[in-house]
Amino acid sequence: LGDNAFGTGGSGTSIVLADASQFPSSGTNFIKVGTEEISYTGVTSGTTLTGITRAVRGTTRAAHSDGATVTNTSDFVAWGEAASGDLVLEPGMWSLDNFGDKAISLIHDGEVFEWDSSLSNATDTRCTIISGAPTASRHMVVSTPDRHLVFFGTETTIGTKSTQDDMFIRFSDQENINSYTPTATNTAGTQRLADGSQIMGAIRGRDSIYVYTDTALFLMRFVGSPFTFSFAQAGTNCGLSGQNAVVEVDGAAYWLSENGFFRYAGKLESLPCLVEDFVFDDINMESGNQMISAGLNNLFGEIMWFYPSSTSSVVNKMVCYNYFDSTPNRPVWTVGTLDRTMWKDSAVFGKPHALDYDAGTDTSFDVVGNTEGRTAYYEHETGTDQNKNGTITAVTANITSGDFDITQDRNQGITFRGDGEFLMKIRRFIPDFVSQTGNTQITLNLKNYSNDTAASSSLGPFTISSSTTKVDTRARARAIALKVENTGSGQDWKLGT
């Protein structure tokens, strides 16, 4: 290479190597010859680097002899540039709570801050680190009504981050968030849990704090002097999947574990779930477990878990349990692709509020070592469609019944279930919608044999409007399943009682 723009008399744009098969061949990459760095954009014939640009990354162009050593520096960074790596860490989640007029906030595995809203200049005052408090903790909760600030997965020696123990609990003196050293005259104290390798999260319940490790559930109850709190194990093999994967409603806690869905209301129960295989066969529990979050929609008695699928690094799916309509023998579950990274119930704003992370939208600033993206803020249960930055998107929904067939026998007042021996004819469908906006689509899926693939009736699917009194179906099969759905914008419906 000569000491000119391309090294070949000013006209060449390529460099020939003895072997370039191990060099990156797509995108903009870099090599180093002597002290000069050169970029290139392609590799041809296994030996030729094309699209070269000399003297990049602040280096100086120089002449190089044939046979000079060429080093691939595509993964190198220049002085002052940010470097990236493949280290996987837990996300920097926050724990938030109130201590009277003070807002308490803890960054995961970090320090705890306070912000006093009662100050006359509160809106002009930054939050400050709480003095005397632990400096590295996984989670934090304010215990009520006794008013202790409790840290989970915290330091055994206050102020020494290297002593952080993921199973260690420390709580402050009553009414004093600056005092954590136990003495004969205060109620501060500590406790280490035994079942599990780390405390995943905690949530305040009606009469206790539910403390979850990765394998078990503990109940932390205020008992007064001399122990301040009691700790009792309430379950095993029921650990919490992620810090925010639990909600409490009406004295019962519901959470998602690596071993299924659970409920605690005085005793541990495994929630019967009709979609458990569907969820757990396609969920990212490796790097995505801390992204799992639970949301409560008490307007409709729904508990939702938002989670990343097995091939996704961001939340992209949802599973929902309806505790209003469920019974032990008939649990009500739904699944979907609603992706929310935060959910706040209607108790605060009157309607649920939630956040949606969009990895495909660039930020206005550079992000190094992670994906760029933006977050949209939604108010739910408003209207019929999704309105994101003025763009209207239909909220589609569907429900399909199980197959039903004709009852063929009746003996002494007992009706026996049909076994598909007879064909049945359905002449018409009479809509029974409690409420309906826009059009709804009805499909009759027909089968003549158990192994048949369900197919729509020849005249279907049928479009039902609010003024439709009946539709003639002229369908015939041994087994029929009813599917109700909406696919367009401005549509919603409620079927039955």
What do these predicted ranges mean?
Residues 1, 74-101, 369:
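Extended assembly-interface regions of large multimeric machines
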Residues 101-124:
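Hydrophobic or amphipathic alpha-helical targeting/insertion segments
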Residues 76-89, 121-292, 334:
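Beta-propeller and closely related beta-pinwheel folds
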Residues 18-21, 51-60, 108, 118, ...:
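Secondary-structure transition/turn motif
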Residues 1-74:
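Autoprocessing Asn-cyclization modules and mimics
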Residues 33, 99, 107-109, 145-146, ...:
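Short loop/turn segments that connect beta-strands within the blades of beta-propeller domains
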Residues 93-95, 197, 237-252, 258-497:
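Beta-sheet repeat architectures centered on beta-propellers
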